[in-house]
């Protein structure tokens, strides 16, 4: 049913998203869900893309929104592409334009088209500095002092960049309340600001396999500074004598693939399988009882929410601010003090050996995952859209 919320000047409100490679990654996957939800609620939705990767859509996905091309290439905000975006916004009568990248020509585009622009940050605020913070903690004392000086310079540079985005954005979306609080504090924003919480959505499976196998799962990219899968291998070395009938499956890929396999050989790890990357994650969630993460930092990890939706109990380090939004009680996962590998190993063994506890937590994490439904996420987007449209009507 058409309402004032999805009408503008007697036509459907048109919301467009910008993407370089689509769909490719967590932000684009959420865009698919949000785009379909907005279409089903009476909005016109278009995704403008440079490279349309149709083979990357989830199996069985029915797309309701339009996808229209931009000039192909690798830089979304070159002068040539910026002009193409301007022309597309005017031609398609776009009311709200959503971007996940800090756009060089955003202010120019707004001036030329009058479009409302929404920036959505799909990482923690100032995530660009997290890897440097980790490197400082691991560095030799002399090198650490040099890195600390460099970090102060980088801090100031990125604060200016974030302030610039906040200045041109009509709305600034973040993934959870703790990210909003952090951004508000670090940028010294007023309490009534443009930052809004637009949480990730996770498709809820229609069938959840509760008959799990004795499998512990890692699923994600191989990226040393952030993911630290080497920690998981050392933890597995500790626990494998105590869990002889359990298996560790590592699903994913990246530049560390060869070195991690070599490390597993050096540690003489047993009952471990490197499965490689895959788009068919459901088959792994269906079998696994426990999900392991050993990251130094994360944003709002979709893999954690997907595991919960499929009844896989997570265990991970309490190493990033959004973790308590996903694991908000002891029944929704196991949090370990960073980065105590002995404590992690002890907790993992205890969880693996306690069938009754895992079964109880399995049901609880499935319930928790319902809070990530597209209806909840869509409602947050609808509230943001209403606010932006009402500013024009007011």
Residue ranges and their predicted role:
Residues 10-12, 17-25, 31, 37-76, ...:
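N-terminal strand-loop element at the rim of the active site
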Residues 28-33, 214, 223-238, 255-261, ...:
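A conserved mid-protein helix/loop that constitutes part of the nucleotide-sugar donor-binding site
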Residues 83-87, 139-172:
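Membrane-proximal helix-turn-helix segments that form the acceptor-binding/catalytic region
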Residues 99-105, 121-124:
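Short His-centered aromatic/hydrophobic patch
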Residues 178, 201:
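Carbohydrate-associated surface elements
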Residues 277, 296:
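Aromatic "clamp/platform" in nucleotide-sugar-dependent glycosyltransferases that forms part
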Residues 317-318, 329-341, 350-355:
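Conserved acidic donor-binding segment of nucleotide-sugar-dependent glycosyltransferases
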Residues 343, 350, 357-371, 379-383:
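A short, well-ordered alpha-helix in the C-terminal region of glycosyltransferases
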